[in-house]
Amino acid sequence: MSQSQSHGSGSPLKYVIVFRPGENKGEQEDSVVSEQLLLHHAFEDTELITLSAKLGKIGIIQALWTLSEDTNDTCKIIETEQETMITIKVEGEFYITLAIGVDPDLLAIPNPIFEGHLWNCYHFFTIKYGDFTSFEKHVLTDLLNEHFVSFWNDLYRKPESLTRNFLQYLCHDFYKVADLDPNGDKQWEATIIQDLLVQTENYLGIKDILVYNIPSTESTYVGKCKYGLIRNFCNEFEDLGHFSNWLQHIHTVFGKISSHVLAENVHYELHSGQLEQTNSDGIRDGNDLNLSDNNNETDSNTFSQLSTNFMHNLTLPITFAYDAIQEVGNTTGINNSVSLFMNYLPKWQNNSTASENEKNKTKARYGYLISPLAFDSLPKSYKLKKMHLKFNGEERKPYHVLFWYYNDVLVVIICNESFDSIWSKEYLNELNKHLENSIKTLYDQNLYDLPNTDNHSNKKNDILNFAYLITDKKRNKLYSSFPDLSWFNEQQETLYRTTLELVSNGLEQLRPQITANELSITTIDSNKQWGLDIMGNILSMLPSNSPVPVTKDASIPLMKKLNFLDKLNEKVLRDISIETLRAIETLSQSINSNIQEEKLLKTSDGILLYIRNDCNNLTIILKNWIQDTKHQTRALKYKNHTLNSYSTSIEDSNLFKNLGPDVISWYSEYKQILQDDSS
């Protein structure tokens, strides 16, 4: 974790460099140094960057490491008046540098946030392709262009994604875990183990099954603590953290998990003008703001070419199409195009007809997002995802990964490359049945709010007066109820709206002679299964003339667990997050060296901030004592404290007791979650 000044936002990213220094000593020729450069990508083409300038930056970075007192550092920062270069060293010989523009007039983003993204970018590359050292230079350069450019361009064009999970980027080696009731029903786990993992046909084929709760940004907000990994079944999966963070990243950037997003067939593009397609090489072209895929461009009006054109439009990202209805309404003409778009989605499977008592509940949606059931004409990335993962100390090697969902629960099935059963339609249908039985039980027993949700959610006690972030250092798990942070102004938020209009218009121009109503009747009831889908609830997004019934109340009665931070405005939440970050940075040395330390502070907004670091956990608790009337007198008298030696038990700490009986009671129960995960 690095300390330095903060930087202006808006569009803070300038360029990214990847290079591998040679073994030559002393002064080197430019031709030699140029061989070391693997990637240089500038986000703004305002001026041509010469090769000499690129090589000069490499020299500065190398000199910093050479002159450093600690050559084992994995991150260093160079600050100038114009920019700041954040560099990480990976695999002992590769350097990755991100340049950040400096603008004191713009809202500041702390350096550790960018450092966290740098590490994530590298780790996501390794689980997708493998380690840098496993490739020849020309192959590595091609893969770096494919991954790094797309990764950073999406963050550059949607900069609010940089800070959405603000404090979590300080713990980039940790992955978010969903906080479910430790006393909840475990039958769903037994179903997966007994019906899938221990079965003879699966035992040597399925390596692991991962279950995540990923509530849609459009769903009823249930609290951040419910977000993350619920369970996996293989203790030897070494890349579990990187894989989990990759899923959280794409969900943060694109808003939803869909077939297109998982197949990485969608990226932001910044243009102005008519919507244009990409060429067959996947080189982005044109002058508009759109989301595009890598299918071939066609200009002909023949039937076969129209089919190709249709496939191009079909694989445009469905991820963003649904927000448009609420954003622009009927006046933009987007409803017809979204209706047309919905007609080309496959029919989803529903549970059996709900009873009279369940009519107000949304029917469950479930099915495959990535599987060999996808339409034959779709690219292979829609049929399976090949990822290079590590298990049980073995070398990183490729695995086939399938994705299945049930409402907001995502299930990931990791299979050996030699497991041919996944190409059988009968096997996939049987797998679908077992997963449905298991995850339905998980929903009914652990995620649904069984009491009357509307009345229950209005109780004052449902809004906790504290929020927490706890890391498990031994298992790299992170538990947090800190809400997402919106860092930027409304100008960036309009990016979604512009993109949605263009995507829908592209679909509307496909076959304008056929009305949306005609297609909704003929295609929704058809038996064609394209194999494309999207997580979350989309029933309410169907047109009113759709034959699929739509309930007025489409919200899922999920269990809520909110805290006072969820109710704060963005500015106050941002200020509290920055003060928390600064307090954590002062502990950076002790966090790395496991020196025990404990602090109790008061933020400028009057919030109590408790931080405790020991060899097992980093614990951060924010307490809103102002609304805690039973505890006001004691809290008002407290002063900032720092202790370097204290009782082994956090519950015996006098500083911890200042947080009040509600926090003490919560932690005594919360210990069971930590203990269950460590068992």
From Swiss-Prot:
GO terms for molecular function: guanyl-nucleotide exchange factor activity; phosphatidylinositol-3-phosphate binding; phosphatidylinositol-5-phosphate binding; phosphatidylserine binding. It is found in: Endosome, Multivesicular body membrane; Prevacuolar compartment membrane; Vacuole membrane; Vesicle. InterPro entries: Ccz1, CCZ1/INTU/HSP4_longin_1. The keyword Membrane applies. Keywords: Autophagy, Endosome, Membrane, Protein transport, Transport, Vacuole. It is a peripheral membrane protein. It holds the Pfam family Intu_longin_1. Signal peptide: none annotated. GO terms for cellular component: Mon1-Ccz1 complex; multivesicular body membrane; vacuolar membrane. GO terms for biological process: autophagosome maturation; cytoplasm to vacuole targeting by the Cvt pathway; late endosome to vacuole transport via multivesicular body sorting pathway; protein targeting to vacuolar membrane; vesicle docking. Belongs to the CCZ1 family. Forms a complex with MON1. In complex with MON1, is required for multiple vacuole delivery pathways including the cytoplasm to vacuole transport (Cvt), autophagy, pexophagy and endocytosis. The MON1-CCZ1 complex acts at the fusion of vesicles with the vacuole, through its regulation of the SNARE complex during the coordinated priming and docking stages of fusion, and particularly at the stage of tethering/docking. This is Vacuolar fusion protein CCZ1. The gene is CCZ1.
